[in-house]
Curated annotation (Swiss-Prot):
Superkingdom assignment: Eukaryota
Major location (coarse): cytoplasm
Name of the protein: 26S proteasome regulatory subunit 7 homolog B
Chain positions of cross-link Glycyl lysine isopeptide (Lys-Gly) (interchain with G-Cter in ubiquitin): K452
Organism per entry: Arabidopsis thaliana (Mouse-ear cress)
Amino acid sequence: MIIRDIMEDPENEGPHNMRSDFEPLLSVLRLRDYETGDIIEFDSTEASEEALSDITEFGSTEASEAHFEEPYSARIKKVEKEINELAEKICNLGIKESDTGLAPPNQWDLVSDKQMMQEEQPLLVATCTQIISPNTEDAKYVVDIKKIGKYVVGLGDKASPTDIEAGMRVGVDQKKYQIQIPLPPKIDPSVTMMTVEEKPDATYSDIGGCKEQIEKIREVVELPMLHPEKFVRLGIDPPKGVLCYGPPGSGKTLVARAVANRTGACFIRVVGSELVQKYIGEGARMVRELFQMARSKKACILFFDEIDAIGGARFDDGVGSDNEVQRTMLEILYQLDGFDARGNIKVLMATNRPDILDPALLRPGRLDRKVEFCLPDLEGRTQIFKIHTRTMSCERDIRFELLAGLCPNSTGADIRSVCIEAGMYAIGARRKSVTEKDFLDAVNKVVKGYQKFSATPKYMAYYI
């Protein structure tokens, strides 16, 4: 108690003068023996110098701790405050209960998770090359595992005999190589990306001047898919393919987009130049995977745009630079009409140069119908003007028949350019609507001024 009073005395200046200030108070010391409970008194003068030095050292240690306690406690309190703020922020944001995060700790089941991980081991990819004694209880399967070998194995608990066929990819376990699950065919991602997931916004009502062509294509594509019983009743096979040819801008690709919108079938769009690959055999492989993916669908429409990129007539230039392109075309010929049935697959092809296509590609059985997209007549051009001005802010007294008569030998793309230029004239004059004079100026600019850039006369020479 004496030492504690010395430490807490406010008039004490420090531990350096504790001995001189409180030495008279220490003349008589009373200490209690905690083992016996007796009180022992002795004179401080008889106390050893070492005991007094311990007292002063104890006082100096407490003072030093009090001196250094304040800065560390401030830092600790600051860090604790930041931690509390972050925890409160997390609770306010709801991250702890988010569906994308972990489940609450009370829902964790580490034992079952560990058991599940032990049961679900990764599988090896193999190819089932042969089935021994099919349709029996003792059926065995020959699987070829790449870089490992061939094995005769059975089925696992999760696989069904009706799901396994010869030539398909399967997943086998790493111990007994038993077939666990069937796998889908391996298809290049670049081929899968050719599938049009979203339906285009083009419809048949958005196409003008192609009424006859639309009817011919609908007979080949839509009628066999929507009413196959009509062909079964007559005992005939529907046409399998259509070739659309005509000058640029005549609406070939637009009709294909309208077909994709109209039918609920899977629509795959392929540009001919995409099948021209650097390495030998890559283009033919992509064609095989295209038709393989198309056969896996219930109904599919394959649209080859700019088919003249790979469908040109075969020739020998003595160098062999086009050999790979010709191999790709030969694969297309086989897929169109080979030993394997094409199934419910309709093929549309579009080109600007039908004169350079290989005759084997154009024969009946591969492309049964050829549809020519010629230049629209006066009625067709008038309809195209009305279609493109449907969403424009125009005056009511515009004579579209007059504008159509001023655009002879113009395609739908040319008329669309006229409508855009008329809108640009209205914007330049700071008007909110397009007048007939704007259309007349646009006709002079596009049809008359850009006549030297038009490729229509050049391409029309191939259709005469």
